[in-house]
């Protein structure tokens, strides 16, 4: 499961992300955050952390530096 999520994120970063303008409000980007979270905490917890991060990445959030803890 962990490897599947990582492959999906890498596919997104290589083929889908270049087609749209940069819009992430955080550093590291949401996709990089997701990779790090899944590698560090596994598919279940890392996946939930990634979903939370993506939900926070919107025009109403200030953004900024937000590393995986």
Curated annotation (Swiss-Prot):
<protein>
    <recommendedName>
        <fullName>Putative membrane protein insertion efficiency factor</fullName>
    </recommendedName>
</protein>
<keyword id="KW-0472">Membrane</keyword>
<dbReference type="Pfam" id="PF01809">
    <property type="entry name" value="YidD"/>
</dbReference>
<dbReference type="GO" id="GO:0005886">
    <property type="term" value="C:plasma membrane"/>
</dbReference>
<dbReference type="InterPro" id="IPR002696">
    <property type="entry name" value="Membr_insert_effic_factor_YidD"/>
</dbReference>
<comment type="function">
    <text>Could be involved in insertion of integral membrane proteins into the membrane.</text>
</comment>
<keyword id="KW-1003">Cell membrane</keyword>
<comment type="similarity">
    <text>Belongs to the UPF0161 family.</text>
</comment>
């Amino acid at each position: 499961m962990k490897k599947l999520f990582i492959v999906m994120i890498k596919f997104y970063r290589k083929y889908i992300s270049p087609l749209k303008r940069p819009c992430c409000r955080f550093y590291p980007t949401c996709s990089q955050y997701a990779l790090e979270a899944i590698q560090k905490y596994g598919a279940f917890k890392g996946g939930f952390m990634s979903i939370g991060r993506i939900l926070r990445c919107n025009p109403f959030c200030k953004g900024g530096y937000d590393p995986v803890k």
